[in-house]
Amino acid sequence: MPILQVIVLAVVQGLTEFLPISSTAHLYLTSWLLGWQIEGLDFDIALHIGTLLAVLIFFARDWLQIIAQGFGIRREGDRELNHNHMLLWLLLIGTVPVGIAGLLFNKQAEGAWRNPFVMGFMLIVVGVLMWIAENAGRQQRDLSSLDLADTLAIGTAQALAVVPGTSRSGVTITAGLFRSLTRESAARFSFLLSTPAIGAAAAKAIWDMHKKGGGLHGMLHADFLVGVAVSAITGCIVIAWFLHYLRRNGLRPFVYYRILFGIIVLALAFIRRPA
């Protein structure tokens, strides 16, 4: 794969994985419109590892505190996390629905559903739900008050992200708003919840490569390393910017973008069918 293509797609992944606008749709449609082929599991692994590194690096202190408190070890840190010692177990429970959905619908997600008609439809539907949540949610709670019901609701929403065009961050932030979390807390929990899911996706891709006769040594080439680095750096920048943005701003620009982008995707799908 040409290095320019690697960089462009890795930037697209890093930008769109953590914004509520669907990384899958943007990667697929960028490649489709530019006539590029995303070849090989190694590149898919690179993007997954890059975005996994982004959340692990950015939330490293949070994860250390969450894990320590989950095992009864007192660790001073973030105020919200200090008041919720069950967060580790809530995050693990919240990951179960997407794991089940991935096992049940992986073939559809990688096959029949991966087309611009499905993506355009889901971009619009989740955009409308995000608009409703933005206006209906009370946005009064933070992570200190998160409970099992919240986790199950947000975790179940994350399971919908197996459908391309949904956006993992978009649907989980929307669910968080419906549970009356503040925008920033909903996004923060969304990113923390994404960590096990992204890690599992990377592990599955590595296992699939192993079954096809590949190995880790085959991934350690320039394209792979550039893809990991670019998507990780871009992802860290986007997470920092987005959390800062949500402290004072709402999600309406992303709602409008999703709906407009969804309409454009559907229009292009009718005009020009993908190969």
UniProtKB/Swiss-Prot annotation:
Catalytic activity entry: di-trans,octa-cis-undecaprenyl diphosphate + H2O = di-trans,octa-cis-undecaprenyl phosphate + phosphate + H(+)
InterPro entries to which the protein is assigned, alphabetical: UppP (IPR003824)
GO molecular function annotation: undecaprenyl-diphosphatase activity
Keyword Cell membrane among UniProt keywords: yes
EC number of the protein: 3.6.1.27
Transmembrane spans: 1-21, 40-60, 85-105, 117-137, 189-209, 224-244, 251-271
Primary location class: membrane
Keyword presence, Cell membrane: yes
EC supergroup of this enzyme: hydrolase
Keywords (A to Z) from UniProt: Antibiotic resistance, Cell inner membrane, Cell membrane, Cell shape, Cell wall biogenesis/degradation, Hydrolase, Membrane, Peptidoglycan synthesis, Transmembrane, Transmembrane helix
Cellular component terms per the entry's GO annotation: plasma membrane
Subcellular location field: Cell inner membrane
Record's bilayer topology term: Multi-pass membrane protein
One GO BP annotation of this record: response to antibiotic
Pfam families for this protein: BacA
Family, as annotated: Belongs to the UppP family.
Function of the protein: Catalyzes the dephosphorylation of undecaprenyl diphosphate (UPP). Confers resistance to bacitracin.
Note: Bacitracin is thought to be involved in the inhibition of peptidoglycan synthesis by sequestering undecaprenyl diphosphate, thereby reducing the pool of lipid carrier available.
Protein name: Undecaprenyl-diphosphatase
Organism in which the protein naturally occurs: Solibacter usitatus (strain Ellin6076)
Gene: uppP
